[in-house]
Amino acid sequence: MENARRLLVLALGSVGVVYGDIGTSPLYAFREALRPVSHDGVTDVEIIGLISLMIWALTIIVTIKYVLFLLRADNQGEGGTLSLLALLMKTANGHTAILFFMGIAGAALFIGDAMITPALSVLSAVEGLKLVTPALSDYVVPIAVVILLLLFTVQSKGTAAVSNFFGPITLIWFVVMGTIGFVHIADDLSIFRAFNPYYAASFLFNEGYVGIVVLGAVFLTVTGAEALYADLGHFGRRPIQWAWFTVVFPALTLNYLGQGAFVLKNPEAMSDPFFLMFPKWALLPAVILATAATIIASQAVITGAFSLTRQAIHLGFLPRMAIFHTSETHTGQIYLPNVNTLLMFGVMALVFLFGSSEALATAYGISVTGAMVVTTVLSFEFLRMRWNWPTWWAAGALLPLFVLEFVFLGANMLKIHDGGYVPILIAATFIVIMWTWKRGTAILHAKTRHIDIPLASFIKSVERQSEHAPVSVTGTAIFLTSDPESTPAALLHNIKHNHVLHQQNFILTIRTANTPKVPKEERVSVRRLSERFTLLEMKFGFMETQNVSQALGLFRKSGLKFDIMSTSFYLGRRKLVPDAQSGMPHWQDRLFIALANAAIDPSDYFRLPTNRVVELGSHVII
């Protein structure tokens, strides 16, 4: 009984978070699919063919690929592109560069989606006010801007207080959406022919080029499917699957069937079939409910962007940024000020640049289809490397999906000149940023490793009794380093400038595992190097906060007890100088240095006590 109750609670939560985006697609998907074929009048067979395409897109891409297959391809319960990438990197042999590029491409495309989704969904909901009264037409964009500004403003306060309402509100949305669709199916029962895939195939065959263009709009029905996989860790596989089959899929199917039947009976309703299905007395409540649903969908995408960025930082794809927890009970509720500001300006720019959901819908789709293609390619590697499927089995299983998604991608590429270039530019920008950071840090590590002094040699030299030996002082010093085999720069500079060495010196390395979380018993390890030097290692999962001060307490089991007030933390601060011979172009050197300078201070990122931190600087030519 308790398990059943927990399943229901998690399923309800997933309705609000996981399915918010795909649940708002009926607002505009069918409307946009009708536009390319409506210039010379739309026949009944064309309408049935369109609805058939939508239903089968939901069935093949969402139900089969995501709900039934990808939810099983988890990294210790976590999903998402970067989580899958981290899992594959463990056993990758010889083609890590390809996997890395695919991973950052998927992540970059998701960021583009996170900008477009709030703008498109909120605009499409608020535009329903035009049908309430045409006098409000000029206020659609200002109202949408105010709603979006409020949404981004409250992020720093956290959404814990209102997140409990997300599931119930979105459930009401799906019930209303499914009910209004069910009612209007009676307008023309011939719409049930849409379940026959013959009508979908016939539409594409008969329409030719226009049919390919229409596919770009049909794909809007499955936008948000990536959220199923990305939010796997928050809710688990069974609740997400249960919510899809009992609530979301039936409601979406009923609504699309209802819209199709409604337009078959009322061809003049093609301008906005979703809202026109509602009677006039219910139109304003429907607009309000739709707006609430789009706000919740936008919140889910923003939260997903925060989570994805944290993963990218911990995996070394982005520089450190400030990360704040907005809930004492939910570790997944985080706030990244830099990402929030970037998304806010990006969303505002899109609203003002396009001005309507109709115009913005042309830009939508490329980022989502691109991300889906990336996920399918990574899934192929997953089947081979993790499930040990023969290559031809894996190819045979995923080739139909890959071909279908590639066709959708091609259809969306036709919209580049109408605004489709926007998500491509956004994704390209973030690919360059992540590639530059990864490449720059690798070059920096190689250069410093080349000039660094091996730690073992250093310990022998300082512990040798001589008149040049540093003065021994009481207390404990912890030196943070990324390379435990080399002497930390801060330790060298401390001896060079202060001529002292503490009684106890700990060389601390912080590593990020290719798993979401690391058990506490595996978090820390100790290796004694000499009487005065000890090597410490902390290991965190890519979904965890790297709180060094808190993790120090775990060393007690190894017989080490740290008194924070008598312990000094030594950090090296590098002043990077560009070098024409670095291996990167000059512009990339400059970008890497700018990213490094923008990174948050390590003492803040690792939660070190600020009054116990000593930073020692050095120049490094990159």
Swiss-Prot record:
Topology within the bilayer: Multi-pass membrane protein
Keywords: Cell inner membrane, Cell membrane, Ion transport, Membrane, Potassium, Potassium transport, Symport, Transmembrane, Transmembrane helix, Transport
Superkingdom of source: Bacteria
Compartments reported by the entry: Cell inner membrane
Catalytic activity: K(+)(in) + H(+)(in) = K(+)(out) + H(+)(out)
Sample GO molecular function, one term: potassium ion transmembrane transporter activity
Cross-referenced InterPro entries: K+_transporter, K_trans_C, K_trans_N, Kup
GO CC, alphabetical: plasma membrane
Residues of the signal peptide: none
Transmembrane domains' residue ranges: 7-27, 50-70, 96-116, 132-152, 165-185, 210-230, 244-264, 282-302, 334-354, 360-380, 391-411, 416-436
Pfam families reported for this sequence: K_trans, K_trans_C
Record's function text: Transport of potassium into the cell. Likely operates as a K(+):H(+) symporter.
Entry's family note: Belongs to the HAK/KUP transporter (TC 2.A.72) family.
Record-linked PANTHER family: LOW AFFINITY POTASSIUM TRANSPORT SYSTEM PROTEIN KUP (PTHR30540:SF79), OSMOTIC STRESS POTASSIUM TRANSPORTER (PTHR30540)
Protein name: Probable potassium transport system protein Kup 1
Organism of derivation: Rhizobium meliloti (strain 1021) (Ensifer meliloti)
Designated gene of the protein: kup1
